[in-house]
Every structure is written in structure tokens, then in C-alpha cells.
């Protein structure tokens, strides 16, 4: 097996100094195009591979970022990761991805494992343990950024859409359409993001002087099955809702199926609203009214924040908590309609 070529040997073959080779392989603009091309050609011909361990000893950075997600199959998470990876690639960072499977304990263990490795920072997307007093979500030397959640600790950073405001706006939209029996299907594993959306829902009802009915609130889970079962519970009530706010678009999609299984129609018989504006939401029949979350932008901004936190100028300096909140946009579509006499009769008669 051929021994890997060293920078020193490349320098000898290219008739340049060792520092020149190092700069050329990093595409330093101080190195001329012809010299850089010659050095890179020699390196490629001899199968040069950079010694990442040696580089990290010099730079005190590994150029690896840990990323913990609840479910890699979740379209929301996929969009966020695409934004993260775009910025990471621009700065020559690699991502170590781990899936918690929606288990808060497993998520915390994953963060612990990443923190104990020689990585530069950790991103936690749709954090399940974000509200828990875990020591790994407190004062860490390695920065942690939560996406779609936040933590009460002083040194855990976060980036979110305006969850409270978004839920309040979409509930106000339903109120403006005349609805008063408005249900909420939440995510019992949603952490702070679910709490904020639930508070927004309640705030809108209070502002409109509409009585809060606890039986209209279902704590399900963010999944098709969770939305289906949550909606079925609401439809089984003697006094049914005429409209429902869902934690996210996946939950709303499950609610669609439950409504149709009951022989009813979305919008005509019951209005449904989501949160996220996933790629399929505008293609549903009827198209889904929802809050647009700029998911890719959230990933980009989270990665930029993490890069700022790991920059040499910030090393060994305690940084106060950074909380970035991005406004969402109400997308009014076909799944919500004005309260009709048909709605009113069904709400008070049940199935």
C-alpha cells in the first residue's frame, strides 16, 4: 500500500516552500493561479489527504458540527438541514447527523456524545429536551443552538419562527370568519414551540372574548396518526368544533383524513389550519391555510450564528444567550371558510 504523500514531499516535487503548498491547497488568493494549479495537480496525482487531526491541533477547530434531529424523515427538518448544509459547505464545515427518534432522553444523550467529541458546536433541530433542565443544555464550552425551540438557560442559543404570533394570527383569521368553536390539536412532545402556539391560540380567543373550552384542546403528537386521532376525538364531542388549529401541517394532513373518514368535507363542514407551509400544503385538496415558516432561512441563520460563536475571536469568551425570532406569514387558502348555518347546526347537534 502506497504511503500517503506529505505536504513536505509535495513542496519538493513542486519546487516551492511548505507554506506555499499549504496556502495553495486552501485556495489562498495570494498564490498565483498557475502555481496553485500545479500544486493541486501534484497533490491529486499522489492521492494527498489532509491530516484533519493535525489541522485541528493547529487551528483548535475540527470543522465538524453536530446536528441532532427528532426525525430525519420530517419534511420540516429536511428543509432546515438543507439551509444548514449550504452555509456549512461555504465555510468548509462537515455535519455529523444523529437522529433522536423523538425521544427526549435519547436526544440529550446524543448531545452529550457530540459535546464530548472534538466538534466545534451543536445544532438541535425541533428539540424535544429544549425545556428540560438538562446539564447539556446549560453552560457549555461548546456552543449549542436550538432550532424551533428555546431553553431557559443563559448560554443556550436559539432560532425560531414567531410561534406565539403565528398561532394568534391564524386563530384570529378563523375568528374573523365567524368561528367560535375552535379546536386546537397540539404536539405533546413539541416542547416550547407547542407551548408558544397554544398560548397564541388562547390569547386570540381571549382578545375576541370567546370562552376557552378545554375539551376542544387535544394533546396529540406531530404525525399523521396524531392528527387523525386528535381530530377524531374532536369529532366525537357532543359539541363539535367548526374549525381547528393544528400544531403543524403534518398534523393537519392527518386531520384531513379523519374528517373525510367521518363523511365530512374540509372547509365546507369544518375549517382546518396548519403551521409550517410544507411543500405539499398548497397542493392539498383543498389547499391548506397555514403559517409559512422560512425553514431553509432558519437553517442558514442557525449555522451562521454557530459559526460566529465558534470564531477564534469568541474563543474562551462567555457569550450571552442569542435568541433570533423570524416572523411567519399567514397563507390563506381553501381549507378555511366563513362560518355557515351548516357549520352551526353540526357544532351543536354532533354527528
Task: Give short role names for the model-derived ranges.
Residues 1-6, 60-172, 176, 234-236:
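Alpha-helical recognition/docking segments in bacterial nutrient-uptake
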Residues 1-62, 351:
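N-terminal helix-turn-helix DNA-binding module of bacterial transcription factors
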Residues 13, 18-23, 57-73, 173, ...:
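Short beta-strand segments enriched in small/hydrophobic residues
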Residues 69-79, 97-106, 149, 159-169, ...:
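Hinge/beta->alpha junction and helix N-cap segments in small-molecule ligand-binding domains
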Residues 90-91, 140, 205-212, 236-240, ...:
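Short helix-capping segments at alpha-helix termini
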Residues 180-181, 212-216, 265-272:
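Short acidic capping loops at alpha-helix termini that bridge into adjacent secondary structure
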Residues 232-351:
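Flexible loop/turn connectors
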Amino acid at each position: 500500500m502506497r504511503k500517503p504523500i506529505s505536504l513536505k514531499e509535495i513542496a519538493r516535487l513542486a519546487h516551492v516552500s511548505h507554506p506555499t503548498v499549504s496556502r495553495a491547497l486552501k485556495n489562498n488568493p495570494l498564490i498565483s493561479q498557475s502555481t496553485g494549479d500545479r500544486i493541486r495537480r501534484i497533490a491529486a496525482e499522489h492521492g494527498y489527504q489532509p491530516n484533519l487531526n493535525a489541522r485541528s491541533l493547529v487551528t483548535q477547530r475540527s470543522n465538524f458540527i453536530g446536528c441532532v434531529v427528532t426525525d430525519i424523515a420530517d419534511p420540516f427538518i429536511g428543509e432546515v438541514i438543507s439551509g444548514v448544509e449550504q452555509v456549512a459547505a461555504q465555510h468548509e464545515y462537515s455535519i455529523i447527523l444523529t437522529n433522536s427518534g423523538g425521544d427526549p432522553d435519547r436526544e440529550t444523550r446524543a448531545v452529550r456524545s457530540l459535546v464530548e467529541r472534538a466538534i466545534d458546536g451543536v445544532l438541535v433541530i425541533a428539540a424535544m429536551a429544549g425545556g428540560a433542565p438538562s446539564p447539556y443544555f446549560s453552560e457549555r464550552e461548546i456552543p449549542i443552538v436550538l432550532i424551533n425551540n428555546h431553553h431557559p438557560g443563559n448560554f443556550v442559543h436559539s432560532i425560531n419562527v414567531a410561534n406565539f404570533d403565528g398561532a394568534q394570527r391564524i386563530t384570529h383569521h378563523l375568528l374573523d370568519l365567524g368561528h367560535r368553536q375552535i379546536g386546537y390539536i397540539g404536539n405533546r412532545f413539541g416542547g416550547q414551540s407547542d407551548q408558544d402556539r397554544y398560548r397564541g391560540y388562547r390569547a386570540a380567543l381571549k382578545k375576541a372574548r370567546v370562552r376557552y373550552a378545554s375539551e376542544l384542546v387535544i394533546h396529540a403528537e406531530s404525525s399523521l396518526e396524531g392528527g387523525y386521532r386528535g381530530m377524531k376525538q374532536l369529532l366525537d364531542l357532543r359539541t363539535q368544533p367548526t374549525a381547528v388549529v393544528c400544531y403543524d401541517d403534518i398534523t393537519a394532513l392527518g386531520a384531513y383524513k379523519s374528517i373525510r373518514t367521518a363523511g365530512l368535507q374540509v372547509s365546507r363542514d369544518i375549517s382546518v389550519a396548519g403551521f409550517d407551509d410544507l411543500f405539499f400544503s398548497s397542493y392539498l385538496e383543498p389547499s391548506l391555510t397555514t403559517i409559512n415558516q422560512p425553514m431553509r432561512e432558519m437553517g442558514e441563520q442557525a449555522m451562521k450564528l454557530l459559526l460566529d460563536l465558534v470564531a477564534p475571536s469568541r474563543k474562551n469568551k462567555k457569550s450571552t444567550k442569542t435568541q433570533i425570532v423570524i416572523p411567519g406569514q399567514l397563507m390563506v387558502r381553501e381549507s378555511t371558510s366563513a362560518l355557515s348555518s351548516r357549520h352551526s347546526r353540526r357544532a351543536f347537534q354532533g354527528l
